[in-house]
């Protein structure tokens, strides 16, 4: 991308492509922690799950522990809609963007991203295609075929819930990599919530 794509902050944009290494270590069946580093191992972000939150909330911290973003999904809609706020606030004025599943009948989530000023949400500002468990996902600018980031890795169902997953993300030059990191985290959370809902429904029907 030629023009800088600044969503979270200009300091997260580089004139060269940025490689991110992401590790997700599962602590419990319902939550996990992410560690995000540069390709050469420098710590960039951590993602923490606050205890006893009334919403599905995740906090993106920088290497110093400062709050960069708050990711919030309502408990009844965590499988299809999340809001992302600047810093540690969840006030309306701190809203940066909303991420939602474009269709509830999709086997693999296709996500649409709407910036805070896109209140009508008719045309998305970004979109994400692919799935964590499919080992690949791609982030596009707007409703176009322009790729601004892509993820690859090797996940297993066991690792998804009980182990440790490693994967890499390549972010295009001039693209906000804090923004991209948050989209990958939300993609995983949406997949996880949808899978748990599906399994719970099957168990109830089975009984």
Curated annotation (Swiss-Prot):
This is Protein LURP1. PANTHER family: PROTEIN LURP-ONE-RELATED 1-RELATED, PTHR31087. Belongs to the LOR family. Gene3D superfamilies: LURP1-related (2.40.160.200). Disruption phenotype: No visible phenotype. Reduced basal and R-protein-mediated disease resistances. One of its GO terms (cellular component) is mitochondrion. It comes from Arabidopsis thaliana (Mouse-ear cress). One of its GO terms (biological process) is response to salicylic acid. The gene is LURP1. It holds the Pfam family LOR.
């Amino acid at each position: 991308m030629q023009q800088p794509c600044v969503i979270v902050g200009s300091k997260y944009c580089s004139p060269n492509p940025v490689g991110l290494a992401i590790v997700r270590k599962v602590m419990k069946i319902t939550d996990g922690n992410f560690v995000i580093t540069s390709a050469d191992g420098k710590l960039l972000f951590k993602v923490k799950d606050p205890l006893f939150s009334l919403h599905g909330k995740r906090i993106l911290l920088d290497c110093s522990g400062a709050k960069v973003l708050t990711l919030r999904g309502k408990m009844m809609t965590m499988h299809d809609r999340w809001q992302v706020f600047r810093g540690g606030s969840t006030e309306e004025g701190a809203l940066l963007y909303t991420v939602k599943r474009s269709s509830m009948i999709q086997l693999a989530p296709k996500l649409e991203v709407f910036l805070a000023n896109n209140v009508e949400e008719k045309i998305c500002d970004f979109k994400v295609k692919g799935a964590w468990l499919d080992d690949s996902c791609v982030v596009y600018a707007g409703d176009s075929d322009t790729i601004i980031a892509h993820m690859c890795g090797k996940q297993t169902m066991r690792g998804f819930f009980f182990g440790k997953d490693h994967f890499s993300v390549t972010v295009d030059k001039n693209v906000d990599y804090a923004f991209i990191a948050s989209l990958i985290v939300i993609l995983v959370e949406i997949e996880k919530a949808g899978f748990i809902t599906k399994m719970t429904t099957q168990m109830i029907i089975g009984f």
